[in-house]
Regions:
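Conserved alpha/beta-hydrolase catalytic His-Asp/Glu region
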Residues: 33-36, 58-123
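Flexible "cap/lid" loop of the alpha/beta hydrolase fold
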Residues: 8, 12, 17-56
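Conserved loop-alpha-helix segment in the C-terminal half of the alpha/beta-hydrolase fold
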Residues: 123-161
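Short beta-strand segments
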Residues: 23-26, 105-107, 129-133, 157
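Short aromatic-enriched loop/helix-cap "lid" or pocket-rim segments at secondary-structure transitions
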Residues: 33-38, 142-144, 168-170
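Glycine-rich nucleophile elbow surrounding the catalytic serine of serine-hydrolase chemistry
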Residues: 1-9
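Catalytic active-site module of serine/aspartate enzymes centered on a nucleophile-bearing elbow/loop
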Residues: 151-186
């Protein structure tokens, strides 16, 4: 889902026997991964890695209310589908192991997780599927950007969901994936 697709794509590029198919769910524009750390992003990373201040910032950003707000405004199209059990699981996961998640957040904020995937997309030798939510205002542009990179890339849209269709409408997402796989078999 989302930015994690860069790691999978680059792993496939390095060893093309790792995967048989790749499914990207709501990935950002492939060009988004072509960033390098700036002075401000490096400062954000450094602040998050400072022991007391960084932990405080991390705890504020991963506070229960902020996680709930993220689900209600960005992750789910229908906020009522975000169960308290799901929200609790996300909150607990963000605070396991002594808040070491702040180092991942620091790397993301510092743009250290952005790895250019354009060259890897062009060299694909396996099916690569992009499933994009229609709720994303840039969905057409994103899908078009991926599709023009390689003939191995197939695309589909999913409606009435936002960023996490695997949680919001798993049956609908499974149907879209099944449809993509059937299209490949023909």
């Amino acid at each position: 889902t989302a930015s994690s697709i860069s790691f999978v794509t680059l792993a496939e590029n390095m060893n093309n026997h790792l995967f048989h198919k790749i499914i990207a769910i709501n990935p950002p524009m492939p060009e988004k991964f072509n960033r390098t750390p700036s002075n401000s992003s490096t400062l954000k990373k450094a602040l998050l890695e400072v022991p007391i201040l960084g932990t405080f910032i991390y705890n504020v950003k991963t506070h229960e209310k902020n996680i709930q707000k993220l689900f209600y405004t960005e992750y789910f199209n229908k906020p009522q589908l975000a169960s308290s059990k799901m929200l609790d699981a996300y909150y607990e996961a963000s605070h396991m192991n002594g808040s070491h998640g702040k180092y991942l957040m620091a790397s993301i904020e510092g743009q250290y997780m952005d790895n250019c995937i354009l060259h890897a997309l062009k060299k694909l030798s396996i099916p690569f599927y992009v499933v994009e939510s229609r709720s994303n205002p840039d969905s057409v542009q994103i899908v078009t950007s991926y599709a023009k990179q390689s003939s191995m890339i197939e695309t589909a849209y999913i409606s009435n969901v936002k960023h996490l269709p695997q949680l919001e409408a798993p049956d609908k997402l499974a149907e879209v994936i099944r449809m993509l796989f059937e299209r490949e078999e023909k």
